[in-house]
């Protein structure tokens, strides 16, 4: 048993070793995967919290990919998992402080997409896009508080 634990720990540690300490690489290895970013989007914009809610995302998560990305985001300290107070059979996923600090970056991605994707759904949240464009830092602080309370933000900014 002790040998297995040591091997498992070593494998886990090796798996998360960074390829370099370039700041861009660190971000990519932490959260720069399509599926990881969609999980962050669902928490921030839609207020999703459970595995089942993430599974219903329109992009169609495969169960193994979803489980893998949730575990990775927990391992790198972006998400935390706790038992649901209302239903102990479920887990609730929330952003840590490290995860909340990604909100301004996610907002910059929204601006970039709104600029270059003619069919961007950012058109549905024009008020939010304008707030981000005018003062990302201020709106990010407000949104961080909403997300801390477990609220999705899209409903507040639909055009």
Residue ranges of predicted features:
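Canonical helix-turn-helix DNA-binding module
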Residues: 58-84, 88
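Basic, amphipathic "hinge/linker" alpha-helix immediately C-terminal to the N-terminal HTH DNA-binding motif
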Residues: 32, 85-108
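N-terminal leader segment of winged-helix/HTH proteins
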Residues: 1-31
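Residues within the helices of the helix-turn-helix
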Residues: 52, 71, 91
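C-terminal regulatory/oligomerization modules of transcriptional regulators
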Residues: 1-10, 104-159
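N-terminal helix-turn-helix DNA-binding core of bacterial DNA-binding proteins
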Residues: 22-62
């Amino acid at each position: 048993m002790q040998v297995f634990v040591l091997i498992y720990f070593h494998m886990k540690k090796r798996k998360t070793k960074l390829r370099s300490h370039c700041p861009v690489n660190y971000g990519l290895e932490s959260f720069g995967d399509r599926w990881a970013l969609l999980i962050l989007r669902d928490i921030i914009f839609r207020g999703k919290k459970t595995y089942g809610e993430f599974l219903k995302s329109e992009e169609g998560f495969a169960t193994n990919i979803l489980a893998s990305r949730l575990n990775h985001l927990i391992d790198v300290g972006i998400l935390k998992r706790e038992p649901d107070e209302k239903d102990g059979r479920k887990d609730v996923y929330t952003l840590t402080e490290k995860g909340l600090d990604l909100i301004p970056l996610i907002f910059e991605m929204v601006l970039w997409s709104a600029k270059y994707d003619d069919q961007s759904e950012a058109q549905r949240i024009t008020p939010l896009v304008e707030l981000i464009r005018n003062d990302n830092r201020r709106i990010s602080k407000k949104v961080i508080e909403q997300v801390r309370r477990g609220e999705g933000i899209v409903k507040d900014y639909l055009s």
